[in-house]
Regions:
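Metalloprotease/metallohydrolase-associated module, dominated by Zn2+-dependent proteases
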Residues: 24-103, 147-199
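Bacterial N-terminal signal peptides that target proteins for export
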Residues: 1-9
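Active-site recognition of the HExxH zinc-binding catalytic motif
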Residues: 118, 122-130
Length: 199
């Protein structure tokens, strides 16, 4: 009886391996900072405006979340069809946040810490959206099959189409989130007011 039980447990374990392997990946998350000058909230905010990261080389932001995503994909020819049998992501998310270059007075430091934590948490939401994008890509592409594609050439065009659709949806989620956060009365708007007004 015990031997049979061990056998069934082993079968269940190895049957579950592909599912486990798919869930194993983890994003590497890094925080980079840029130096800002000033002792008061308004001085710090003005320095952010001068030194903040440029988005697409055009507009400066308070903070920014970027990512690098590569894939290890395995294709198989199955009866003349090309099948994407596995895809393992390698994801690095980088958060860029401001950091005062000098020690701040006590009152400014408290206000700054509130501002910084709020901005960090905002960017972390963008990070979670990136992770969702990667999971959506996995769900939409692993197992996809293109008939009449023994050399796995046509499947790449179909893959590109699916990725494009998912990325457009991802960008829209980010824009919608920022619109609420940065609008009048939004979280970022409130954080800026409290930093600048010292309250």
């Amino acid at each position: 009886m015990k031997a049979n039980m061990r056998c069934w447990l082993l079968v269940a374990f190895f049957t579950a391996l592909p599912m486990v392997a798919r869930a194993e990946w983890q994003a590497v998350e890094k925080v980079e900072t840029y130096a800002i000058a000033g002792k008061t909230g308004i001085e710090l905010y003005e320095s952010i405006g001068e030194r903040g990261p440029k988005i697409r080389g055009l507009v400066r932001a308070i903070a920014h979340t970027d990512f690098k995503l590569t894939w290890s994909r395995k294709y198989e020819n199955q009866d003349g069809a090309c099948v994407l049998v596995s895809a393992r992501p390698n994801l690095t998310i980088t958060y860029t946040l401001p950091k005062p270059a000098e020690k701040l007075p006590a009152a400014s430091r408290r206000n700054w810490e509130t501002f910084f934590i709020g901005m960090r948490d905002h960017e972390k939401v963008h990070g979670e959206m990136i992770k969702k994008l990667v999971k959506d890509i996995e769900a939409a592409t692993v197992g996809m099959s293109v008939p009449g594609d023994p050399k796995c050439l046509k499947i790449r065009a179909e893959l590109k189409k699916r990725l494009s659709e998912l990325f457009v949806a991802h960008q829209q989620r980010n824009r919608d989130f920022d619109r609420v956060e940065m609008g009048d009365g939004g979280n970022i708007h409130q954080l800026i007011l409290k930093l600048v007004n010292g309250g």
